[in-house]
Amino acid sequence: MIDTALIIFIALTGGLLLGGLVSGLDRILTARFQSRIGPPLWQPFYDLAKLWSKEKTVVNVWQAFCAYCYVAATSIALVLFVLRSDLLLILFIQAVGAIFLVVGALSSTSPFSQVGAHRELLQILSYEPLLILVTIGIFLETGNFKIAGIYSWNEPLIMRLPFLFVVLGYALTVKLRKSPFDLSTSHHAHQELVKGLLTDYSGPILALTEIGHWYEVVLILGFCSLFWATNWIGMIVLVGVTYFFEVLIDNVSARLNWRWMLGYVWALGLSLSLVNLIWLYVG
C-alpha cells in the first residue's frame, strides 16, 4: 500500500516536472527554428506560478468544475500508466478528460470558446479512432492490453508495427494541437480564434488546464515508448526523435481547416492501420 502511494506521488510530481521541461524544450526548439534565442528551459514553470498568483475569475462554476475534472482525468490516466494498468482503460479516462475540457468551453457564451470547443470535438473524433486502432494492433502482436505485459515483450514493437507507429504520430500531432492541426487552440493565438477553446480560462483555472496538458504530453510520450520497450536507450531515443519531429512539423506547417484534417487523418491513418493489421493477421 505504501509502495503504491509512493509510486502515485512520484508519477504526479515527476509527470508535472517532466511535462514542464518538455514544454520548455518545445519553446527553445521553436525559437531555434525561427532564429531566436528563446526563453529559458524553466519558463513554463514561471508562467505557471504567475497564473497561480492571479485572482481566480471564472465565467461560471461549471467551467471551473470541468477544469478540475480535466486535470483529475489526465492525472489518473498518467498514474494508471505508471502503475502499468490496462491500456484501454487509460485511453477511456483521457478521452473523458478531453470531453470535460470541451464542455467547460461550451459553458461560456463567448463565440471564440464555442468555435474552439466544436473544433476540439472534431479533433477528438479524428484521433480517438486512431488510438484505438493502435491499441488493437499492440494487442494482436503481444496478446495483452496490460502495459506490464507490453513492456515485457521480447522485441521492439516498432519492427512489427511500423505503420501503426506512424499513425500514432498523426494522432499525437492532433492530440497536442500542433500545426497543421492546431484548430481549436494553440500556444500562438490565431486571429479568428483568439485562444479558442481556452479563451475564457484565466488565472489558477487556466493553470489547471496547463497542468492537465503537461500530463497529457507525458502520457502520450509514454504511449510512444511502448514501441521500443526492450531497453531504455532505444526507448529514450525513439521518444526524443518522435517529439523533435512533432516540433519540426509544428514550425513548418500551415494550419489546415477541419475538413482537410478529417480527410488527411482518417484517410491516411485508417489506410496505414488497415495495412499493418492485415500484415499482422497474415504474418
What do these predicted regions represent?
Residues M1-G283:
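Alpha-helical transmembrane segments of multi-pass membrane proteins predominantly involved
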